[in-house]
């Protein structure tokens, strides 16, 4: 059993904030907006939202062309549905997605943001002459009161390994409270993948490095290096060549039907076969999201399909297929990178050797925005 934990002291504390409050132009309910902004916050929420007041986080996200282009393409893909409709952007940040929706013809966009970036979002909306369509309200989506129902909910809620930050419950809250029947959620579906990986270069650079440093034997630090390498997940970029097997699905989320309670604990059993002779250094996690309409009850989720079929389907997508944003190792890198769970020591595996076990991802009791990961692996 190889336990790992995601916590606030790791590199994972880098991604962004959201949630908020909004009010349509028709209501002008400034009292509701003020109440939402003044609602008391738990300490972990306060720190979380405060971190997203820093421009650097928003710069990294917007400069991620894979991410930003995918959202813009998805909005244009669904333009006929968005045009003339009411949209809610949950966690709007700088307001870029709200502006995209307004330019696509939305009648009204509620741009909801809990961090202080809401102030700049208002200025951006005004500078683009969209303040008659986009209303930015500063507060958590859970605290705002909006009388009207919305036709579309859009949000860039994904964190490292999809679920870090636990912003998805806020999107689901907005869905249950405001989305009209038959409404659109962007993204509509999300899938977390996992696979064993090999990465000798990284291991040698972090662990074996200490055996000989400028001719000095510093191998006494090797056990410490192994401890720090394996006790927390690492956020880094790997390539398709580092992946030892077809990935398996840890969790598939249909944003139209998923319940927030399901995030408290997710356990998945796996059984994969190594595609090569190589040392296994740990496991990698990544995700993809799809911008589709409501699910067809007869459709299969990725967890019901062979991973090879999922990948082949993705590569065959045409112009009429839903937009997909992928953070897989074989695809163009994004600011999410991949999340790696390293072992203290590599284990040699043969080609076609079976690797099996289970993985449990659960919310931290101390802070539900953080994750605990427990990995069981047998070879």
UniProtKB/Swiss-Prot annotation:
Instruction: Domain (SAM-dependent MTase PRMT-type): give its ranges.
Output: 45-379
PROSITE patterns xrefs: SAM_MT_PRMT
Question: Which enzyme class, named as a word?
Answer: transferase
**Which EC number(s) does the record attach to this protein?**
2.1.1.-
Region of interest called Disordered, as start-end residue ranges on this chain: 1-35
Q: Does the keyword Oxidoreductase apply?
A: no
| Keyword hit for Cell division | no
Query: What residues sit in the active site?
Result: 156, 165
Matching entries from SUPFAM superfamilies are given as: S-adenosyl-L-methionine-dependent methyltransferases
The residues listed in the UniProt record as binding S-adenosyl-L-methionine, with positions renumbered to this chain, are: 58, 67, 91, 113, 142
Function, as annotated, reads:
Arginine methyltransferase that can both catalyze the formation of omega-N monomethylarginine (MMA) and asymmetrical dimethylarginine (aDMA).
Name it.
Probable protein arginine N-methyltransferase 6.1
């Amino acid at each position: 059993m190889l336990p790992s934990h995601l916590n606030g002291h790791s590199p994972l504390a880098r991604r962004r904030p959201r949630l908020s409050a909004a009010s349509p132009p028709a209501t002008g309910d400034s009292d509701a907006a003020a109440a939402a902004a003044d609602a008391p916050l738990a300490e972990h929420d306060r720190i979380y939202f405060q971190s997203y007041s820093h421009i650097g986080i928003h710069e990294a996200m917007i400069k991620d062309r894979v991410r930003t282009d995918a959202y813009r393409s998805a909005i244009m893909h669904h333009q006929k549905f968005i045009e003339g409709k009411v949209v809610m952007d949950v966690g709007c940040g700088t307001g870029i997605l709200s502006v995209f929706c307004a330019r696509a013809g939305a009648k009204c966009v509620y741009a909801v943001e809990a961090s202080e970036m809401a102030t700049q979002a208002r200025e951006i909306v005004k500078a683009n002459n969209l303040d008659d369509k986009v209303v930015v309200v500063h507060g958590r989506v859970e605290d705002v009161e909006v009388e009207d129902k919305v036709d579309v909910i859009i949000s860039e809620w994904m964190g490292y390994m999809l679920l870090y930050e636990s912003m998805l419950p806020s999107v689901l809250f907005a869905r249950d409270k405001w989305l009209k029947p038959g409404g659109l959620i962007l993204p509509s579906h999300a899938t977390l993948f996992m696979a064993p990986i090999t990465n000798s270069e990284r291991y040698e650079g972090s662990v074996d490095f200490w055996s000989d440093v400028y001719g000095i034997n510093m191998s006494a630090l090797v056990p410490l290096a192994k401890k720090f390498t394996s006790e927390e997940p690492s956020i880094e970029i790997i390539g398709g060549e580092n992946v030892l097997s077809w990935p398996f699905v840890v969790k598939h989320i249909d944003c139209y039907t998923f319940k927030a309670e399901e995030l408290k604990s997710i356990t998945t059993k796996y059984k994969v076969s190594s595609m090569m002779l190589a040392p296994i250094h740990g496991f990698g996690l990544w995700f993809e999201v799809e911008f589709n309409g409501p699910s067809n009850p007869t459709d299969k989720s990725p967890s019901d399909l062979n991973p090879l079929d999922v990948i082949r389907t993705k590569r065959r997508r045409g112009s009429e297929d839903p937009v997909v944003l992928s953070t897989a190792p074989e695809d163009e890198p994004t600011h999410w990178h991949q999340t790696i769970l390293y072992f203290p020591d590599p284990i040699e595996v043969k080609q076609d050797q079976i690797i099996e076990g289970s993985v449990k991802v659960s919310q931290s009791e101390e802070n539900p925005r953080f994750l605990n990961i427990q990995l069981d692996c047998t070879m």
